[in-house]
Amino acid sequence: MADNYTPRMKKLYDDKIVKAMTDKFGYKNAMEVPKIEKITLNMGVGEATQDKKKVEAAAAEMELIAGQKPVVTKAKKSIAQFKLREGMPIGCKVTLRRERMYEFLDRLITIAMPRIRDFRGVSAKSFDGRGNYAMGLKEQIIFPEINYDRIDQVRGMDVIVTTTARTDEEARELLRLFGFPFPIEAQEKEAA
């Protein structure tokens, strides 16, 4: 990427979100304002126990979505019922930081989420108590990088947004300002 290029979401954070968060929560220092630290994408491929090529296909799709090569995750323990042995590839994950993270966040919010079938916003209850947010996507085909005709099967993935926020309330406000579509009822309950 060029030296003078700043992702749209990073610019939004610097120009508007820092000020809005400071006004709402009364931070004394700009460094206190929570920010998104990293976004982790995880795709579990259970069918990989029978066919090793499934993990390779999943990793290739994730590389297209994230713009970064994923790490293949391996089984930590052997489980006989699942025909799983220790060290077998069972999925892939990728951790996005800095510019790539902001670019992915932009694509997720503006392009991918509106393409989800029967989409009514993301759950406001998926915070972990420490200001991190996790959500599941049922289909990888919501991303425009994935060619529907080339996929072998529809797979879901987990998207974990790790923030520096100390509370869920701060994290919810941060993600709302970034454009995460939380349902209106959740925002009204929070205000009451």
Curated annotation (Swiss-Prot):
Gene Ontology terms for molecular function: rRNA binding; structural constituent of ribosome; tRNA binding
Entries under Pfam families matching the protein: Ribosomal_L5, Ribosomal_L5_C
Protein's UniProt keywords contain rRNA-binding: yes
Keywords annotated in UniProt: Ribonucleoprotein, Ribosomal protein, RNA-binding, rRNA-binding, tRNA-binding
GO-annotated biological processes: translation
GO CC, alphabetical: ribonucleoprotein complex; ribosome
HAMAP family linked: Ribosomal_uL5_B
Record text on subunit structure and interactions: Part of the 50S ribosomal subunit; part of the 5S rRNA/L5/L18/L25 subcomplex. Contacts the 5S rRNA and the P site tRNA. Forms a bridge to the 30S subunit in the 70S ribosome.
Family the UniProt entry places it in: Belongs to the universal ribosomal protein uL5 family.
Protein name: Large ribosomal subunit protein uL5
